[in-house]
Structures are given as structure tokens and as C-alpha cells.
Amino acid sequence: VLHYLTTPKFENKPRDCERPLAIMHVPKTAGTSVVTGISQSLKVSEEVRGIDGLLLGTFDRFSEFDDEVSRTIYLDLSKMPDAKLIMGHFSRNTLTARYPDAQLLTFLREPLSRLLSHWVYWRCMSDEYLARWGAWQDCIKLSRGTLREFLTDPRIACQTDNLATRMLLWPDKRIGNDSFIDPERDSSLLRDALNRLNAFAYSDVIENPHFHANLSKWLNIELPVMHLNPTDRVPENLRIRLDKELDQETLWLLDHRCRLDAKLWASLARRRLPKGGEIPSLQRQITLKAIARYGALLAP
């Protein structure tokens, strides 16, 4: 009860159709289906999609990217065109700096299930696709090793370590681009991340049974129901037993890489889910289902 009373209320603001809409899409939150539905429904003439430098850590060999990939990466805010709809893996800072008048929207997913999905999704990427990313493919290929290796390589801490928190706060000296977050900074980072999330015009957890209806009502449109960009069955040569991956150390790493995001998600879930729901029980249910799902996709 005390936690409920002391955390932000995350009260959604009314939609202002005169203002741009900017979506902070956290990877693997089922956001591709949502943003595509929003795009198709709003039918705006100016739209921006892509990513910023947050997801690339300290990587700087951008000249190796093929042209199609390069067009989706915005390292210079001045090169982001004016738009009414901005959707992508952009940090909050990128969105507010380039589109200060935009209403911000984001969704959170239970973070351990999101992180497992991220690992398996990368593991499914073909060599042909990865070649378009130049030397960054070496970082994505870390997903082809053990889950423990994926969770401990600092080159991809920018995507594996409390990603939602990073997207809310980046750039921030307390968060390294190629290092894991120091637990001694957790309290101040969580406080600031909660306050940033509280300032969004609209936010929700994707596990909300009324997620689709509530978002449609806020946007004053009927969003189509889609299921795009799902995580596929892992290629045969990369299949492993997930139960053997989840030893005590790896389970600790999963919890540690999600510790801040888990508190963000739980705080928002308490405000969004029907009253009476037990958040810890729901979180366990979601993670157990995720382990079963991704275990099946990985199974030899």
C-alpha cells in the first residue's frame, strides 16, 4: 500500500491531435504491431521510424552499415525530419530534444520475458541479414552463445541491462554505454526513471487485458489487431535446452539485468491493471509462461 501511495500516478493526459505523437518503442515489447496499427490508422503524411545511438553502445563503425540500415539510424538530431508521427527505438531524450511539442507514448513489458525474447529473437537472425550491419553483427551474434554470455558481455549492455530505464534516462553519466549499471546508483536512477515515465502523455503495460481498447479510446481510432515481428523457432543448428541454461548464476544475472525495469513495470502495472491483482504473482506467471514459450522455440 505504501508503495502504491508513494510512486507516481502515471495519469494519462488527453490526446491533442494538433501535436505530434512520439512513441518510445522499447525493443521486444510487441510494439511493432502497435506502432504499425497506429500508423495505418492515423494515416499521417510525415512519419519517422528508426533508432538512435542508445542501442549501439560505443559502436562507431557506421560506415559498414548498408544503405537501408543507415537510413534508419539517427545519430544527428538535425537530420531527423519534421513529422507528425515518430516511432522507433528512440530514447526519451532524442524524442523530446527533436520534437519538444510532441506527446510521448510508451509501453512496458514484464522485463525478464522481454529479455528472453530479445535473446531468442537475435539468435534467429540469419547471416544474410546480419551482413547488412557490418561489424555490429559480432555483437548480435553474442546471442548464439550461452544465455550467460549474452548477459555478461558489456558491448551489448546497452540492450541487455535494464533497457527501459536506459531509454528513459540516456544519455546519463550514471549509465555507461558499454558497462553495466552500478547497483549503488539504483535508487537515484529508479527515482528519475519513474519521474520521466510519469511525464509521458500515455503509458501502459502490454499485459493489461484492456491494453488495445484503452489505446484505441485514447487515440480516438479503432486500432487493428495485429501480431507482427514475432520471435521465430530457432534455427536447428542453434537449438539448445533452456532448462540447462537457467542455472543459479544465470537466473541471478537475469534478475540483475532486469532489477530496475522490473520495478518500473510493477509500478506502472499497479496503476493500469484491474484493482485486486497481485503484481508479484502476475509477474511469476508471466515469466513462467515466457520460459515455457522460449524453451519450446529453442528446444532441439
Regions found by a protein language model. Give the residues of each.
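A conserved segment at the C-terminal end of the G1
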Residues: 33-47
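Short beta-strand-centered segment that lines the nucleotide-binding/catalytic pocket of NTP-utilizing
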Residues: 50-52
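Glycine-rich phosphate-binding P-loop
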Residues: 24-34
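PAPS-dependent sulfotransferase catalytic core
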Residues: 89-90, 177, 207, 224-296
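Juxtamembrane luminal stem/stalk of type II transmembrane Golgi/ER carbohydrate-processing enzymes
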Residues: 1-19, 282-300
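General alpha-helical segment detector with a strong preference for membrane-spanning helices
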Residues: 32-34, 114, 265
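PAPS-dependent sulfotransferase catalytic domain
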Residues: 4-9, 55-107, 113-227
